[in-house]
Amino acid sequence: MASKIFFVLAVFLVMSAVLPESFAGCKKLNSYCTRQHRECCHGLVCRRPDYGIGRGILWKCTRARKG
């Protein structure tokens, strides 16, 4: 019985570490995204960072610019 509970808990922890955005329903600030604006949370847009490691390859949810 204890081994089943441990297994379920381990699977949940792995899934929550691998797919944190899927549990939240939308992707939060600085989460990786796939160029679709609607997958990021309200007020965020998906764009390529122009700095840092992997720039131009990995897209992230960032704050929408005002103006």
UniProtKB/Swiss-Prot annotation:
Intrachain S-S bonds: 26-41, 33-46, 40-61
Keyword RNA-binding: no
One annotated GO molecular function: acetylcholine receptor inhibitor activity
UniProt-annotated location(s): Secreted; Nematocyst
Keywords: Acetylcholine receptor inhibiting toxin, Amidation, Disulfide bond, Knottin, Nematocyst, Neurotoxin, Postsynaptic neurotoxin, Secreted, Signal, Toxin
Signal peptide positions (record): 1-24
GO cellular component labels: extracellular region; host cell postsynaptic membrane; nematocyst
Sites bearing Lysine amide, chain numbering: 66
Record's function text: Alpha-toxins act on postsynaptic membranes, they bind to the nicotinic acetylcholine receptors (nAChR) and thus inhibit them. This toxin shows inhibition against mouse alpha-1-beta-1-delta-epsilon (CHRNA1-CHRNB1-CHRND-CHRNE) (IC(50)=1215 nM), rat alpha-3-beta-4/CHRNA3-CHRNB4 (IC(50)=5.173 uM), rat alpha-7/CHRNA7 (IC(50)=4.786 uM), human alpha-7/CHRNA7 (IC(50)=8.869 uM), and rat alpha-9-alpha-10/CHRNA9-CHRNA10 (IC(50)=202 nM). Also competes with alpha-bungarotoxin for binding to orthosteric sites on muscle-type T.carlifornicus (IC(50)=256 nM) and human alpha-7/CHRNA7 nAChRs (IC(50)=19.81 uM).
Free-text domain note: The presence of a 'disulfide through disulfide knot' structurally defines this protein as a knottin.
Additional information: Negative results: does not show activity on rat alpha-2-beta-2/CHRNA2-CHRNB2, rat alpha-2-beta-4/CHRNA2-CHRNB4, rat alpha-3-beta-2/CHRNA3-CHRNB2, rat alpha-4-beta-2/CHRNA4-CHRNB2, rat alpha-4-beta-4/CHRNA4-CHRNB4 and rat alpha-6/alpha-3-beta-4 (CHRNA6/CHRNA3-CHRNB4). Does not show activity on rat TRPV1, human TRPV3, rat TRPA1 channels, the human ghrelin receptor, human neurotensin receptor 1, rat ASIC1a and ASIC3 channels.
Name of the protein described by the UniProt record: Alpha-actitoxin-Ms11a-3
Species whose genome carries this gene: Metridium senile
